[in-house]
């Protein structure tokens, strides 16, 4: 799953490099490190959610399973919104701190701000994937991610080659493709007949449950960030 998600940025880089130019390629590449860090951290929290959900499922405790599922999604929404605001507001400062070359900085800022504008979809997908894995549906989450990866490549050609939108087009394509995987996985969970069934009105933070999920997932998230860095 991590490899497929990293392919978003890889596909953007290849198509931008071939059809826009070397500076645009460098701009997309400069944005890769913080994006990989984000993917790793959100997947770590998703692992924590999956562990907690699977424990309650194994114990046959449907009430706690439902609470864990809906708390996990609430964590994802909060984290996604915080990352959106932080990424859009601080994207330029982050790239400057990473010593991004001046000649590619403007394009890099455009790419990373648009990417973080849609990062909520990626974070929510990662959390739903953790829930699906806990429920024994890991193959389905990978299929949804594969569909999103194909969508990203198609939209890259539409926005970059067809509409000549440059790095902005690449970032928009990535956001829309992540929306695809997010919607597909949420739709499946909303139609599920087991304890992992999602009801949008039930998504809320239960403090004790949120603390448990974060305690389990945080070490993995930090480890993933270190590996990605």
Please tell me what each predicted stretch does.
Residues 76, 131-155, 172-175:
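Alpha-helical transmembrane segments of multi-pass membrane transporters/permeases
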Residues 44, 85, 149-153, 179:
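Hydrophobic/small/kink-forming positions within alpha-helical transmembrane segments
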Residues 13, 25-85, 122-141:
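Small-residue-rich hydrophobic transmembrane alpha-helices
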Residues 7-10, 19-22, 56-59, 134-135, ...:
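Helix-loop interface residues and adjacent transmembrane-helix termini in multi-pass membrane transporters
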Residues 1-51, 115-122, 211-229:
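Transmembrane helix-bundle signature of multi-pass secondary active exporters and lipid flippases
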Residues 53-120, 162-218:
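Short alpha-helical transmembrane segments in multi-pass integral membrane proteins
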Residues 37, 152-157, 182-186:
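Hydrophobic transmembrane alpha-helices of multi-pass small-molecule transporters
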Residues 2, 14, 18, 51, ...:
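Transmembrane alpha-helix boundary and packing residues in multipass membrane permease domains
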């Amino acid at each position: 799953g991590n490899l497929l998600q990293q392919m978003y940025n890889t596909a953007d880089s290849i198509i931008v490099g071939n059809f826009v130019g070397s500076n645009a390629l460098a701009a997309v590449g400069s944005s890769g490190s913080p994006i990989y860090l984000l993917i790793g951290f959100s997947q770590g929290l998703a692992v924590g959610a999956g562990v907690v959900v699977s424990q309650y499922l194994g114990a046959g405790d449907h009430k706690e399973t439902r609470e864990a599922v809906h708390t996990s999604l609430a964590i994802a929404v909060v984290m996604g919104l915080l990352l959106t605001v932080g990424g859009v507001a601080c994207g330029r400062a982050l790239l400057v701190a990473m010593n991004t070359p001046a000649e590619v900085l403007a394009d890099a800022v455009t790419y990373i701000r648009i990417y973080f504008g849609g990062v909520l979809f990626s974070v929510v997908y990662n959390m739903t994937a953790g829930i699906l894995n806990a429920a024994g549906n890991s193959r389905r989450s990978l299929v949804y991610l594969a569909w999103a990866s194909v969508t990203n490549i198609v939209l890259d050609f539409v926005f970059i080659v067809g509409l000549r939108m440059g790095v902005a087009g690449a970032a928009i394509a990535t956001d829309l493709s992540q929306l695809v995987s997010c919607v597909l996985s949420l739709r499946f969970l909303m139609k599920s007949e087991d304890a992992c069934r999602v009801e949008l009105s039930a998504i809320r933070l239960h403090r004790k449950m949120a603390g448990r999920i974060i305690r389990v997932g945080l070490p993995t998230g930090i480890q993933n960030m270190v590996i990605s860095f």
